[in-house]
UniProtKB/Swiss-Prot annotation:
It comes from Acaryochloris marina (strain MBIC 11017). HAMAP family: UPF0276. The lineage of its organism: Bacteria, Bacillati, Cyanobacteriota, Cyanophyceae, Acaryochloridales. This is UPF0276 protein AM1_3026. Belongs to the UPF0276 family. SUPFAM superfamilies: Xylose isomerase-like.
Length: 276
């Protein structure tokens, strides 16, 4: 089994359409991200993940922790996640700064939080509980919400920066989401990046968006757009060569297309790696 001490370079999101290609051809990709919720039930998906895990470093990324929900933490889900993490030994475990459940009922979306001091403390406590249960720090990912709460007392980046310190967790920085939010809500994305603590950024996501009537939607169904590539390069200038993932979740293309996107990201990463 490949040692799971760290990752570097540009990885690709693991999708079932590409299991056979990866296992047969063993492409030169430095690491892969698996959607943890897809493997909690065991069976054939977990079998494939274990086969791939034997060859590649893996990170686990989920959508169901519901860190911002008023519901109690779902201990059944956390137990399954811990069992998966203990079995796969991922480099990182991550989820979103969001809520996805009400009164025990889950819905198929990631809802944003009010950015207030009280919510900050509440979510920080829940993250701390999750980390204690899992026995590891987690990464939280920033969203691309299309609505904002009127009573926000903090900007998203102020909220995130404070949360990372209070919860003692790390950030999975989704550059596409920052770009989409900046365009839709009218802020300078560099203000966002400049507010984040450099030492807390452990992974970056890149994806494609869709534009409709001058509004951007984070669909993960297109190549990374030029403006996102530019913002990504600016992020690397601030944070250094942070391991980066190409996400593609709808209209999933051939593995070669994803490899080309990852190679483009790695070209930029190489420009910020220390020279021997």
């Amino acid at each position: 089994m490949v040692a799971m001490t760290a990752i570097q370079g540009a990885g690709i999101g693991l999708r079932s359409q590409h299991y056979a290609h990866i296992l047969t051809h063993q492409p030169a990709i430095p690491w892969l991200e698996a959607l943890s919720d897809n493997y909690l039930g065991g069976g054939l998906p977990l079998y494939h993940l274990e086969q791939i895990r034997a060859q590649y470093p893996i990170t686990l990324h989920g959508v169901s922790l519901s860190l911002g929900s008023a519901d109690p933490l779902n201990m059944d889900y956390l137990t399954q996640l811990k069992q998966l993490a203990d079995r796969i030994e991922p480099v990182h475990v991550s989820d979103h700064l969001a809520w996805v459940s009400v009164n025990g009922h889950y819905f198929n979306d990631l809802a944003p939080l009010p950015y207030t001091e009280s919510v900050l403390h509440y979510v920080a406590d829940r993250i701390s509980q999750v980390q204690e249960f899992l026995g590891r720090r987690i990464l939280i990912e920033n969203l691309s919400p299309y609505l904002q709460f009127r009573h926000n007392s903090l900007t998203e980046w102020q909220f995130l920066a404070a949360l990372l310190v209070e919860a003692d967790c790390h950030l999975l920085l989704d550059i596409n989401n920052v770009y989409v939010n900046a365009t839709n809500h009218g802020f300078d994305p560099l203000d966002y990046l400049d507010a984040l603590p450099v030492d807390r950024i452990k992974e970056i996501h890149l994806a494609g968006y869709e534009e409709q009537d001058h509004f951007l939607f984070d669909t993960h169904g297109y190549p990374v757009q030029p403006g996102v590539w530019t913002l990504y390069q600016q992020a690397l200038q601030r944070f250094g060569p942070v391991p980066t993932l190409i996400e593609w979740d709808t209209d999933i293309p051939s593995f070669d297309v994803l490899m080309a996107e990852a190679q483009q990201a790695d070209t930029y990463l190489c420009q910020h790696r220390p020279q021997n």
